[in-house]
Amino acid sequence: MAKYRAGRINEEVKKEISSIIRMDLKDPRISAMVSVTKVDVTKDQRYAKVYVSIFGDEKSKEETLEALKSSSGFIRREVGHRIKLRYTPEIIIQNDDSIEHGMHIDSILDKIKENEDHDNK
């Protein structure tokens, strides 16, 4: 039962944080496309690790990540207003490059397949 509730809390916090980033943050440094990939709220609901995937060049990624980290207090307050929990979790923003890593592996596999096709001819 507790696992089920934790999963629901994670998904609800993820949905609200995505909405806050998309609609409510007005920071001009957030220029790249940002998506929240995962949220892990601790069992005591004191902390929430928010994994974000940022698309763009390296400079805009760094600026966007810094802007999100500096906006974590605002995000926390908004989550507290929107979701009724015993504690409003402290938001910890972390970069998630798993999507880019997956795309890189796909490109390597495509190159290997091309080389095999070329060698077989």
Curated annotation (Swiss-Prot):
Record-level GO cellular component terms: cytosol
Function comment: One of several proteins that assist in the late maturation steps of the functional core of the 30S ribosomal subunit. Associates with free 30S ribosomal subunits (but not with 30S subunits that are part of 70S ribosomes or polysomes). Required for efficient processing of 16S rRNA. May interact with the 5'-terminal helix region of 16S rRNA.
Entry similarity comment: Belongs to the RbfA family.
Record's keyword annotation contains Cell membrane: no
Xref: PROSITE patterns: RBFA (PS01319)
Assigned keywords, A-Z: Cytoplasm, Ribosome biogenesis
Molecular functions (GO terms): ribosomal small subunit binding
Biological processes per GO annotation: maturation of SSU-rRNA
A Pfam family recorded for this sequence: RBFA
Extent of the signal sequence: none
Annotated PANTHER family: RIBOSOME-BINDING FACTOR A, CHLOROPLASTIC-RELATED
Protein name per UniProt: Ribosome-binding factor A
Main subcellular location: cytoplasm
UniProt subunit comment: Monomer. Binds 30S ribosomal subunits, but not 50S ribosomal subunits or 70S ribosomes.
Annotated InterPro entries: KH_dom-like_a/b, RbfA, RbfA_dom_sf, Ribosome-bd_factorA_CS
Domain of life: Bacteria
Localization per record: Cytoplasm
Organism: Clostridium tetani (strain Massachusetts / E88)
